[in-house]
Amino acid sequence: MNDLIINHIAELILPRSTDKPLKGKELDELNVVKNGTVVIKDGKIVYAGTHTDDYDATETIDASGKVVSPALVDAHTHLTFGGSREHEMSLKRQGKSYLEILEMGGGILSTVNATRETSEDDLFKKAEHDLLTMIKHGVLAVESKSGYGLDRENELKQLKVSNRLAEKYDLDMKHTFLGPHAVPKEASSNEAFLEEMIALLPEVKQYADFADIFCETGVFTIEQSQHYMQKAKEAGFKVKIHADEIDPLGGLELAIDEQAISADHLVASSDKGKEKLRNSDTVAVLLPATTFYLGKEDYADARGMLDNNGAIALATDYNPGSSVTNNLQLVMAIAALKLKLSPNEVWNAVTVNAAKAIDINAGTINTGDKANLVIWDAPNHEYIPYHFGINHAEKVIKDGKVIVDNTLSFKA
């Protein structure tokens, strides 16, 4: 006897299973089954496809008029941080740039101070609250970065919190050491601080899967970023890079040359960088909510990347300064509107390709897969990025069990 059948599904979203990320035109290929059925046993998918009455189960969910998809994957977050920075909104309204706010002692450095002052247990409670919000919105796989400690003690504290969350909730969660995220005030120079972070790589390896660096004007140069990435690979890390967010320094090209698993942001990436994506499996993780929140007009050139047969994914970039949202559904809407992605491209970018960007087996519904699913209160898959700003996730299913039920009920 099976454990659960989800039946009469209006649309069942079945992203293509592949060893490599979907590239170029492949991103627009999505199998959407009308009147679908999903069968689950022992936390695994037994069947997913067109309607069938050939299976029995102890529990049945009628998903008439609903969409069912793989659980979402958020491939770029800064989940563990102390404090908040709502006071910076007035500075943004005055026209202050991100780098200007950073030079004033705000930005990342403000969060660094708050994170350093927050105990590990309090940091855990805050991050847990934010993670549960993500789960309620349909996310069951997350990447979580450090980068707000900027010293040994506090970088380790962030990574330990991230690992504790993964263990408590048994999530598909990857952890990223982003020690070179900014340069703390106490550092004698960028170069000296970078060497401190490189020296930490062997110690943080037990808590982190990836090593990341912020390659940007006023932070770390292309040459410094390459040095760090090479040292990280020597220490056994797969590497990522925050690249070309503000200035076209060539971070995307560097990521491809160093065979990074992903390059993230890429708002200012050059045509040369986009062309190099053609022969690379590095995933371009685009973060349109960041551009939206910062009030900028120029978004990452997703269409240019796809035209060059690149692989792209979408993520929230959840952080307290430049993307204060942990709702990946909102990112889906912004991507459709501002990056000009089709609904199919959006869905693949938050499922199978996002999973490839953090090297996990998720984002698909195939026989034998973990039964990590979302039942959406929406008539079709196009509706979710169309009707923006609310939570469409009705039920979130982890390992075949309903762990979130957002069904609304009112008392008169």
Curated annotation (Swiss-Prot):
User: Which pathway does the database say it acts in?
Assistant: Amino-acid degradation; L-histidine degradation into L-glutamate; N-formimidoyl-L-glutamate from L-histidine: step 3/3
The record's HAMAP family line, in alphabetical order, gives: HutI
One GO CC annotation, please? cytoplasm
Residues where N-formimidoyl-L-glutamate binds: 148, 319, 321
Species this protein is from: Staphylococcus aureus (strain MSSA476)
Query: Where in or outside the cell is it found?
Result: Cytoplasm
The Gene Ontology biological process terms listed for this entry are:
L-histidine catabolic process to glutamate and formamide; L-histidine catabolic process to glutamate and formate
Residues bound to Zn(2+) are 76, 78, 242, 317
Q: Which cofactor does it need?
A: Zn(2+); Fe(3+)
Q: What is this protein called?
A: Imidazolonepropionase
Q: How is the cofactor bound?
A: Binds 1 zinc or iron ion per subunit.
Annotated EC: 3.5.2.7
Task: Indicate which residues the UniProt annotation says bind Fe(3+).
Answer: 76, 78, 242, 317
In which family does this protein belong, per the annotation? Belongs to the metallo-dependent hydrolases superfamily. HutI family.
